[in-house]
């Protein structure tokens, strides 16, 4: 929070102090002083008036208890100032000070903006006087929120301290009756509508306990006066810790006595139309919904309060209102909340995600035989019974009353239903901890229910026995005996029937924990945990018939149907009719959800729940081998194809020769179980249910492998399975309806997208051999595995991409592949849609008779028939697909291929204009350093195309633009790119995080780079300590060199930049230290480090351009410059003189020196004491004249830096013309505001003075820039 701007007389006053409740007169006095001085300090011109108003201020302070007098005085001051912003501040300040609005008569004061601030203040503070003022003038406030000129304040953002004069609005307590009186009068059909800030404020105030009922005010002995300022006793209780009115009742619950009634009253207002717009209702409900569980006493609400809030929210729930599960993240994190929901069954309907499971089972018997699991699930190690369950009063009931017994059983059934639903929800969202927790609760509940049922059976058996004994000792009358016997017999039959029903319940298992085993099994695969797999295998492989194995069926259902592949997302994933929002009717109403919304919303939820990026399966090859050996052994009984389908998916994420071999070992056993038969009309598959799923998965895997261009595994599938092409085509058709398939291909090839990287090292695989890719292409075409029609073109597109990236590819190879594509009329892939009218030719000439609409990728001649360059065609088509992949992969070989296909003259002709989005050419410079000249040439050419649509179409390119840093720091192909996406090591060095930087550098120890970060981007030496520099140097020094060890193991980390030479690292540190005037670091290197400072190469470096540039940096002070002018008998002087005096110095040097002169002439004057002959070279004078810096030139002549002899006749004429023009401006008094400040006195240089004084007047150039002259 910022400080209030005050003048020195009142600087001791801290405006942050909460003022509204004044404890003594001194506080009032301080406040009035601070407020008034703040008003005047806003404007420099107004400060003068403050002295005139000292008498008025004294008068105000003398009469500070007379509110009417103070109001009149402040009103007069504000009106006279006449500044709208000041009016707003003063007005709101006065509201906050005296808690009552001022009815200003001046028109400017009661402007629309001020009306809004009054309303805002009233909503935030609920100040009754302010509310009454609004009611009194409600006509003025009508339609306030609809006025487009008034931008309402976002209640989530803090109001500017300037606007509130640094005053936090203190919320008062308000009586419930007063609040609703205001609400009903102010917000009616003819009044002002609710705004968002009102909704937010009222709900927050209610939950903070700021609204109290009349009963409570009487208990607290509060007086109901016209002002609502609380007394001291009331203040302690109400304004203390937000624990107002929270009194513990007998049950130990905290009782919120005001919240339920207040919320119900607001609900009534909503229902009666006072709050009549859906948007406002929605905002209010969402605020309430989100505020309620955030309250720290939430879990201690009693049932009465819960029922109130349930009744309030339920009528207003809309199907779309809380559709996303992640809008209520607290539900998934809190066991207590779930327990709470279970205890209050009415309340859990508020959570649609849980409610859906209840709806799903409303019309089905959860306890039917279909849910019985004959396995011994209780034996699983994961399901411990040591968690204490809830203490249920029903468990302690006596068993005498049959109805009570039945009720207790029904209660257990209800509890089990809820536990099932909640556990299932956590399983679906992969929260294993809570899923196991509620599974344990489920077991406890089942155990309790079994005990209760056994108890009931025993009591019924006793009752039957008592009936049997009583029948022998009953009445003597035959009639009565007969009737008694018949009654007893009927009762006995009823009891026996009850026992049968209870025993049937006892046989049933009220839960199914197959999901627990399934998820535990997948987790064990990920962790290569063979012992867990063994324990699960003992439980689930009871049924020897594979087709009826419930665990296997569950596997197929959960994985093959509902769980898309993690990295190769099957087209089925995009078919939302199957797995998307429409399967949740309680969350999404039919036809009321947005397609893109679904994709974003469900992608994460439906993704495979086993993330193996950092798993043992991925990283430890030995553990993976042991796991495979066990799974293939006879010891593993649950050898099912579905398990190995999952392993196939895991292996997709690993790209090594070993993983390819394991992939083949797994896939072939699956393929041997498939049998296919074909008919003349359609291709049919005669497979059982399991193999049909495997068959379908094969299709999914194939599509995935095409996407990631992994043609080794692709070839394995082609060799092993007769694919159901019709099925694949159907999936693609389904996918096309929902999301562009072509766009997905490009997404999968985005190497910088973390979601789709599949290589174990986090790099995109480009090790496909050209021969392998070509063989697969021939196999696809020769065996007609996939037709070359439009539906299957994506496979050939991806294959072409892999050929472009393959190792060993040459231009002739590509032309050979192009010929195959042409012969079979296969279209080439293209990034640009709807440009099929451009016909490209591979024979370096335009064939107008060629009507095949395809994109040529290499030998495109950008000329039209007249011989002129065809710019329009070039901009749209210029081999952009190759550019796209070269751009992403930054493949030097591929760039050369592309460049060779164009002549240099062609490049020069179409590279005349630059792309507007490029701020400078730093990218091209960097690329030229990092890659070959041909790569730099193509890179430059890409950006010089004005309408290169990829730049607009793919947001990923934005990171390549030179913003604060270039793509250099955010590029996967960069040798120092961090695989996990964290900061680049050069950024870490600039921030002084040396150890982190060098830890990172170890990851790329095999890479090299040619230079340190450029000086201009290094912020390292601004705040760095000397100890840090020593650490940086020590980290680059070899320690304990051992000749017996491999030299590469002992190289310091930074030597990867410069091999074994640490000197350049110190050179870099030295140049940066000079530029930042860090003489302590310079002393460390040049005085204490004798070994470095005495090297001939160091002396040579000190006289080089880098040091000269550092000495002339704006942050290098005169002391540092003088140090180097005298260092080692002035060895730097000659090089400085050479750079400053010679006229033929480089343009860059001219610019550097000129920039230094602009920033301050002090360094130049210091140099003149060491180089008496030093004067301005003609090139620098020429630079000043060229940039029209005539005032600067005149000033340098006045102080003697430049003489008339230094100027040419033309320059003298130009200077004379400028002086004449300047004099003419003075005479005619032209209105050139940006010219020399006429109020400044004429400056006459004092040549005798050696230092600049603070009294030196400022000079202004014609452009308005101020120059601070520094005298000799």
UniProtKB/Swiss-Prot annotation:
Could you tell me where the Low complexity compositional bias lies? 468-487
- Chief place where the protein resides: nucleus
Positions the record marks as coiled coil are none
| Keyword Aminoacyl-tRNA synthetase set for record | no
| Biased composition annotated in UniProt, kind: Basic and acidic residues | 393-403
Q: Name one GO biological process term.
A: sporulation resulting in formation of a cellular spore
Give GO cellular component annotations, separated by semicolons.
Answer: nucleus
Q: Where is this motif: Nuclear localization signal?
A: 146-161
Q: What does the record say about the knockout? A: Cells produce large aggregation streams under conditions in which wild-type cells form discrete aggregates. They are unable to induce prespore differentiation, do not express prespore-specific genes and do not produce mature spores. The vast majority of these cells participate in multicellular development and preferentially localize to the very anterior of the slug and form the prestalk and stalk components.
Annotated Acidic residues bias: 374-392
Q: State the residue spans of region: Disordered.
A: 369-403, 468-490
Q: What keywords tag this UniProt record?
A: Nucleus, Sporulation
Where would you find this protein in the cell?
Nucleus
**UniProt keyword Magnesium, yes or no:** no
User: What role does this protein play?
Assistant: Functions autonomously, very early in the prespore pathway, to control prespore cell differentiation, maybe at the level of transcription. Also required for proper aggregation.
State the name under which the record lists this protein.
Answer: Presporeless protein A
